[in-house]
């Protein structure tokens, strides 16, 4: 039973799928019903994602594997950890969330990733990659210690095997001889950017070797001659590779390697998993799937259909009209190419995010200076440090949330040695549909405490370009943060201008009398809503530009000429940019009431970014409301007068 192409007409009835409310219902089906169910499930995934947006290619590729796992194993007693977690839509549909898929990645809807608080079947949250083997091993050992008899299964794919953490876990797991642990490599040759490196080439050689293919075919012919042996041959299908290629990379880690097998063939998947279920010790199953499986358009262009917005499945994704505003990612990509044209020492580095970070054009034009290191953020940062020691100008393009994974390297390998590495930090602040796991809420706080760091936050497209240029001129590690999505509509200037180090600018001055003068000290994306609040309240607004070094002179000047100060940032308040202003204020000896506005001390869920910012009080109306209630209301006047008398 193998996957078939979807004939999408929008009228699929889902007769079988409607009967599945949990995996127990699935396990009651006859084996012959599973492929029709897979066809319905694949069509349902396509129909759902086309209406909400989300990850499509990888989910179309996990349909049969998901069905087989829940059919063979006793979930949720047996644990499944999905890695990367965006390949779990079929899993969510089969585990009681079919009728919630219309809310996928929407405000107050279900998450696009596994979430423990959402379902008992979501055993571990996995939105960042390469964590599944560690988590599943912990579950397997924990079950042993608790005396529980259950399997722990890590499904790892989408480039996640390129990360060192996966191999650290395998190294540990390989000596756990009694652990009921299964690692499934979902080999679909698909990370967000194509997988890279020696490991990927090794896997490709294993799968495409003519000797293995010919030998396997010969073994199967021999075994199938005698009918009594035929069933044995089928049961031992997963061991065929071991008969001709005995020592694999994974066996060296202490795993029993099985495969590769067709991840879209239920007649191969189910008996293989049933056999594995009877084994003890760490098992490694190599499953080959196809991204976009069953939907011709996604099969032809899996990158385009990796994470689409809403579209008509019958027509496919249509080219969007050129937007009026550039995205910050586009601004970065254009800047990097311009700098590389001017200076042959400029080198671009990405940890498997070529498209997402805007480096497609750079790779085309400067291939010898482009390095995609795979999902290896720690290596990316230290690699950049090494390049810097040789007089090159490395630029690390990285999402804020993924820079967290390389914090020690940022401190020990780059900042401690004061190496001139530029960090272009994309997706800073809230990121919308991807939610808390991908929010760039912490970069200002965790970088600000590191000696030798310079940190800038861009308020518009041209400022982003000029900040990146300024960063490239610095003799020390420098970060420029900018948000996901479109800018404010400001045109970028081709000519480069270096921004004075540690200097902000006043964008608006108040005309209020003494006692009513408010100064808003805004950072990055919060400059625009702060200007809106400033217009409403007639407040001074400063674009602070630098988080480190903070413009202490401007902080003091605003404190001396205003009655109240407000700091606004799209990041966590604790330890962030506002804290830098308060520290500078304390150093100045000028005492003024201060409000620090930013992201609250909680994880912000997925949803429309504008709605989420408003919920956090970080739109123009919310900023004005906070200022009015704290400083400008009659009650605030009474409280202020009482403090002055005291």
Curated annotation (Swiss-Prot):
Catalytic activity of the protein: D-glyceraldehyde 3-phosphate + pyruvate + H(+) = 1-deoxy-D-xylulose 5-phosphate + CO2
Gene Ontology cellular-component annotations: cytosol
Known EC number: 2.2.1.7
One BP annotation, GO: isopentenyl diphosphate biosynthetic process, methylerythritol 4-phosphate pathway
Cofactor: how bound: Binds 1 Mg(2+) ion per subunit. Binds 1 thiamine pyrophosphate per subunit.
Gene3D superfamilies tied to this protein: 3.40.50.920, 3.40.50.970
Cofactor(s) needed: Mg(2+); thiamine diphosphate
GO molecular function: 1-deoxy-D-xylulose-5-phosphate synthase activity; magnesium ion binding; thiamine pyrophosphate binding
Enzyme kind, highest EC tier: transferase
InterPro entries per UniProt: Dxylulose-5-P_synthase (IPR005477), THDP-binding (IPR029061), Transketo_C/PFOR_II (IPR009014), Transketolase-like_Pyr-bd (IPR005475), Transketolase_BS (IPR020826), Transketolase_C (IPR033248), Transketolase_CS (IPR049557)
Positions contributing to thiamine diphosphate binding: 86, 127-129, 159-160, 188, 295, 377
Pathway: Metabolic intermediate biosynthesis; 1-deoxy-D-xylulose 5-phosphate biosynthesis; 1-deoxy-D-xylulose 5-phosphate from D-glyceraldehyde 3-phosphate and pyruvate: step 1/1
UniProt keyword annotations, A-Z: Isoprene biosynthesis, Magnesium, Metal-binding, Thiamine biosynthesis, Thiamine pyrophosphate, Transferase
Positions bound to Mg(2+): 158, 188
Assembly information from the UniProt record: Homodimer.
Family: Belongs to the transketolase family. DXPS subfamily.
HAMAP family, alphabetized: DXP_synth
Function statement: Catalyzes the acyloin condensation reaction between C atoms 2 and 3 of pyruvate and glyceraldehyde 3-phosphate to yield 1-deoxy-D-xylulose-5-phosphate (DXP).
Protein name according to UniProt: 1-deoxy-D-xylulose-5-phosphate synthase
GN (gene name): dxs
């Amino acid at each position: 039973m193998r996957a078939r192409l979807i004939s999408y007409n929008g009228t699929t009835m889902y007769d079988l799928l409607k009967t599945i409310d949990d995996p127990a219902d699935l396990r009651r089906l006859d084996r012959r019903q599973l492929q029709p169910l897979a066809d319905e499930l694949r069509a349902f995934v396509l129909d759902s994602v086309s209406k909400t947006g989300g990850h499509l290619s990888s989910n179309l590729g996990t349909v049969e594997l998901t069905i087989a796992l829940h059919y063979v194993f006793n979930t949720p007693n047996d644990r499944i950890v999905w890695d990367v977690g965006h390949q779990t839509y079929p899993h969510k549909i089969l585990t009681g969330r079919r009728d919630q898929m219309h809310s996928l990645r929407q405000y107050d809807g279900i998450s696009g990733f596994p979430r423990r608080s959402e379902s008992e079947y979501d055993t571990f949250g996995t939105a960042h990659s390469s964590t599944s083997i560690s988590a599943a091993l912990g579950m397997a050992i924990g079950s042993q210690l608790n005396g529980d008899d259950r399997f722990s299964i890590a499904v790892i794919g989408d480039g996640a095997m390129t990360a060192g953490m996966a191999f650290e876990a395998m190294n540990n797991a390989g000596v756990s001889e009694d652990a009921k642990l299964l690692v499934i490599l979902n080999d679909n040759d698909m990370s967000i950017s194509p997988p890279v490196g020696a490991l990927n080439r090794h896997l490709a050689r294993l799968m495409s070797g003519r000797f293995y293919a010919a030998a396997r075919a010969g073994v199967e012919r021999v075994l199938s001659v005698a009918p009594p042996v035929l069933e044995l041959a089928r049961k031992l299908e997963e061991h065929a590779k071991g008969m001709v290629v005995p020592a694999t990379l994974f066996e060296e880690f202490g795993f029993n390697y099985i495969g590769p097998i067709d991840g879209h063939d239920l007649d191969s998947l189910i008996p293989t998993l049933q056999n594995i279920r009877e084994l003890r010790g760490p098992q490694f199953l190599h499953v080959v799937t196809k991204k976009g499986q069953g939907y011709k358009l996604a099969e032809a262009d899996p990158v385009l259909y990796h994470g689409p917005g809403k579209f008509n499945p019958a027509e496919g994704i249509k080219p969007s009209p050129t937007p009026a505003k550039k995205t910050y990612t586009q601004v970065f990509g254009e800047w990097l190419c311009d700098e590389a044209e001017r200076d042959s020492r400029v080198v671009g580095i990405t940890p498997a995010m070529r498209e997402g970070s805007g480096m497609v054009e750079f790779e085309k034009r400067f291939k010898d200076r482009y390095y995609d290191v795979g999902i290896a953020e720690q290596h990316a940062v230290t690699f950049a440090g090494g390049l810097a020691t040789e007089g090159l100008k490395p630029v690390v393009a990285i999402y804020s949330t993924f820079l967290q994974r390389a914090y020690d390297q940022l401190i020990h390998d780059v900042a401690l040695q004061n190496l001139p590495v530029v960090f272009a930090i994309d997706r800073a602040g809230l990121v919308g549909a991807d939610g808390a796991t991908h929010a760039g809420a912490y970069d200002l706080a965790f970088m600000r405490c590191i000696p030798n760091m310079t940190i800038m936050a861009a308020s518009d497209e041209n400022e982003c370009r000029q900040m990146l240029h300024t960063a490239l001129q610095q003799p020390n590690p420098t970060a420029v943060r900018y948000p996901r999505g479109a800018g404010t509509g400001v045109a970028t200037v081709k000519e480069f201008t270096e921004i004075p180090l540690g200097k902000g600018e006043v964008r608006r001055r108040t005309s209020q009398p003494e006692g009513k003068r408010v100064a808003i000290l805004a950072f990055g994306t919060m400059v625009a809503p702060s200007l809106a609040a400033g217009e409403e309240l007639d407040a001074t607004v400063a674009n602070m530009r630098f988080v480190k070094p903070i413009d202490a002179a401007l902080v003091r000047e605003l404190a001396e000429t205003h009655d109240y100060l407000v700091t606004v940032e799209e990041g966590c308040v604790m330890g962030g940019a506002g804290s830098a202003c308060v520290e500078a204020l304390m150093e100045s000896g000028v005492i003024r009431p201060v409000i620090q506005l930013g992201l609250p001390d909680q994880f912000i869920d997925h949803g429309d970014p504008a709605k989420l910012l408003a919920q956090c009080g970080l739109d123009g109306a919310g900023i004005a409301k906070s200022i009015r209630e704290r400083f400008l209301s009659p009650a605030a006047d009474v409280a202020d007068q009482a403090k002055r008398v005291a």
